[in-house]
UniProtKB/Swiss-Prot annotation:
Claim: Plastid is one of the keywords in the record: no
InterPro entries attached to this UniProt entry: ARM-like (IPR011989), ARM-type_fold (IPR016024), TPR-like_helical_dom_sf (IPR011990), TPR_rpt (IPR019734), TTC12 (IPR043195)
The keyword Repeat belongs to this UniProt entry's keyword annotation: yes
Function: Cytoplasmic protein that plays a role in the proper assembly of dynein arm complexes in motile cilia in both respiratory cells and sperm flagella.
Gene: TTC12
Organism: Homo sapiens (Human)
Modified residues (Phosphothreonine): T71
Pfam family name, one: TPR_8
Subcellular locations according to the entry: Cytoplasm
Protein's name in the database: Tetratricopeptide repeat protein 12
Length: 705
């Protein structure tokens, strides 16, 4: 056998070995191995096609013929090799076609499984997911979905197996790690559970908030597990309070006793709950269910107020729940995740019986002391009823009102509460509008301020602000409260200041509820500009800067009220925030009325105050200052008086700067144009500085705006 034939034979044998291995791998039970084999086969076929094309393109350059041409004979090895590869190619194409068909079937089975899962039919869901996996073994979502269904049936070991298969399909499958973490948590493999959750963070750092919550769940459950072990040991050792707690729960589990029997037993039990051991034993021996499922006690809660004994039972239960939930996250969780208890707690906050209302509020405060407790409140309580109940405490004593608003503040800072608030604002807006109708003379001023401040903070979000601003009753409520507070500005200083903050946010939303509303708001703010309080002055100017442009009628009233003089004083003595509002008001006034321009010139003869603002780092301030200066150029002889200043150079720099906002460039360009029109000598200077080109480039912004 010559060298070429030997080489071809070795190549053929190598191909046979490799192809045999590929066929074995394609028949593997491991979907990952199977997928790699399919990809490798496709790669080999591609290379074979390239080789064939290359062979077809070869031409013989030496055309000398010594003997007649003979038909090229292929060796048996070559024929067998090509036939084998052809069969592999055909098989690969058939497999690809079957895979596409199976993908469609697997997707359909996945949807059926999801429907069954949503209906709570977890066995059927598992069956459908399994059928889908028979069609497509490397579909990771079927493994994670089936794992979730197994979790619902508390078959955690099978769930873990499915998660492992999902990770074989995709080693960065965060869903698989999530379900693995949950399953290991249920199996009390706390360290393994933590590692699973931390792996999610490694794969996707953006899930930090969620992972933090998962890890917190692991910590809490491990802590509860240790508490139960210790409680068992103390009970077995015969500790007096532990044994008494267990015995009292057995006594209270007796059905159909008179209400006084339960009230007395619960009060004794409450006195026994002094430590974590007793709290844990209460939970371990189904204390929550013994109390909340008792028909007599349930009847007392539903009819409380008709009978003193029934009221006593309700109060005693609420005090017991406070005792068992104090600084005990697991007991808090068990109490609140039960739907009936969560609904009852929200309802009791609005009870007509003062004692019940106060004790249910005290229980809520116990829950809200920790982050996990606040999460329980947000996730499980009826937040609309809760919010309505909290604002109703404004009618209570200063201490209770402030405590309620403190709780409202804590909840409002939680991101999940904010999401809920935006989605449910139409339902809670009437309660918030009711707050604005409160008489400040009879309510706690500090608590009222807290409540309005919460509304102000929440209104910073555009969707929330849009709903609030669109509600005519809410806007009228702001006005009426402001009017009542103006009767004694010194007494209600904090309320006015906070309310103006809310109204500033509302005035960001255009158009306003009505022009009439905007006019009335402006009048109130013009009146408040006579205040001696710096904070009120600044915020009144802030509101006015947002309402003034809505109507010429308002501008006229503002001019008659001496707003130009007051705003010029702001510019000379106020801080940056006050100056920002003042220059915007002056820009609006000078844009519409010649007398406003003349008064600015009279109060700032060389326009030095205005020109100083052009060097500010605040672009809004600079833009409005340029606009105001441009308006003032329409007053005769003003432009001529500025020939010895560097105003032209400053405006030119602003108009040509790419670092400035478009509004600054446009306003500076307009001011330049008015300056050169009013005083031709400025136009000559502009030409020398090649400023016309800059002005031309600025014009494109004006035409686009």
């Amino acid at each position: 056998m010559d060298a070429d034939k030997e080489k071809d034979l070795q190549k053929f044998l190598k191909n046979v070995d490799e192809i045999s291995n590929l066929i074995q791998e394609m028949n593997s039970d491991d979907p990952v191995v199977q997928q790699k084999a399919v990809l490798e086969t496709e790669k080999r076929l591609l290379l074979m096609e390239e080789d064939q094309e290359e062979d077809e393109c070869r031409t013989t350059l030496n055309k000398t013929m010594i003997s007649p041409p003979q038909t090229a004979m292929k060796s048996a090895e070559e024929i067998n090799s090509e036939a084998f590869l052809a069969s592999v190619e055909k098989d690969a194409k058939e497999r690809a076609k079957r895979r596409r068909e199976n993908k469609v079937l697997a997707d359909a089975l996945k949807e059926k499984g999801n429907e069954a899962f949503a209906e709570g039919n977890y066995e059927t869901a598992i069956l459908r997911y399994s059928e889908g996996l028979e069609k497509l073994k490397d579909m990771k979502v079927l493994y994670t979905n089936r794992a979730q269904a197994y979790m619902k049936l508390e078959d955690y070991e099978k769930a873990l197996v499915d998660c492992e298969w999902a990770l074989k399909c995709d080693e960065k499958c965060t869903k698989a790690y999530f379900h693995m973490g949950k399953a290991n948590l249920a199996l009390k493999n706390y360290s393994v559970s933590r590692e699973c959750y931390k792996k999610i963070l490694e794969i996707n750092p953006k899930l930090q908030t969620q992972v933090k919550g998962y890890l917190n769940q692991v910590d809490l459950q491990e802590k509860a597990d240790l508490q139960e072990k210790e409680a068992h040991e103390l009970l077995d050792s015969g500790k007096n309070t532990a044994v008494t707690t267990k015995n009292l729960l057995e006594t209270l589990s007796k059905p159909d006793q008179i209400p006084l029997f339960y009230a007395g037993g619960i009060e004794i039990l409450t006195e026994m709950i002094n430590e974590c051991t007793e709290q844990t034993l209460f939970r371990m021996h189904n204390g929550f269910s013994i109390i909340s499922d008792n028909e007599v006690i349930r009847r007392c809660f539903s009819t409380a107020g008709n009978d003193a004994v029934e009221e006593m039972v309700c109060v005693s239960v609420l005090k017991l729940w406070q005792a068992v939930c104090s600084r005990n996250e697991e007991n808090q969780r068990v109490l609140v995740i039960h739907h009936d208890r969560a609904r009852l707690l929200a309802a009791l906050l609005s009870s007509k019986v003062l004692a019940i209302r106060q004790q249910s509020f005290a229980l809520l405060l116990h829950l809200a002391q920790t982050e996990s407790g606040r999460s329980l409140i947000i996730n499980h309580l009826d937040l609309t009823r809760l919010l309505e109940a909290l604002v109703s405490f404004l009618d209570f004593s200063d201490k209770e009102a402030n405590t309620a608003m403190g709780l409202f503040t804590d909840l409002a800072l939680e991101e999940r509460f904010q999401v809920w608030f935006q989605a449910n604002l139409p339902g809670v807006l009437p309660a918030l509008t009711g707050v604005l109708k409160t008489d400040p003379k009879v309510s706690s001023s500090s608590a009222l301020c807290q409540c309005i401040a919460i509304m102000g903070n929440l209104s910073a979000e555009p969707t929330t602000r849009r709903h609030m601003a669109a509600c005519e009753e809410f806007g009228d409520g702001c006005l009426s409260l402001l009017a009542r507070c103006e009767e004694d500005v010194d007494l209600f200083r904090e309320v006015i200041y906070t309310l103006l903050g809310l109204m500033m946010n509302l005035c960001l939303q255009a158009p306003f509820v009505s022009e009439v509303w905007a006019v009335e708001v402006s009048r109130r703010c013009l009146s408040l500009l006579n205040s001696q309080d710096g904070g009120i002055l600044t915020r009144a100017a802030g509101v006015l800067s947002r309402t003034l442009s809505s109507s010429l009628k308002i501008v006229e009233e503002a001019l008659r009220a001496g707003v130009v003089k007051k705003m010029m004083k702001f510019l000379k003595t106020g801080g940056e925030t006050a100056s920002r509002y003042a220059i915007k008001i002056l820009a609006i006034c000078t844009n519409s009325y010649h007398e406003a321009r003349e008064e600015v010139i009279r109060l700032d003869k060389k326009l030095s105050v205005m020109m100083k603002l052009l060097s500010s780092e605040d672009e809004v301030l600079v833009g409005n200052a340029a606009l105001c200066l441009g308006n003032c150029m329409e007053v005769p002889n003003v432009a001529s008086s500025l020939l010895k200043t560097d105003l032209l150079q400053v405006l030119l720099k602003l108009a040509g700067s790419d670092t400035q906002k478009t509004a600054v460039q446009v306003n500076a360009g307009i001011a330049l144009g008015k300056l050169c029109t009013a005083e031709p000598r400025f136009a000559a200077q502009l030409r020398k500085l090649h400023g016309l080109e800059i002005l031309n480039s600025t014009m494109k912004y004006i035409s686009d705006s």
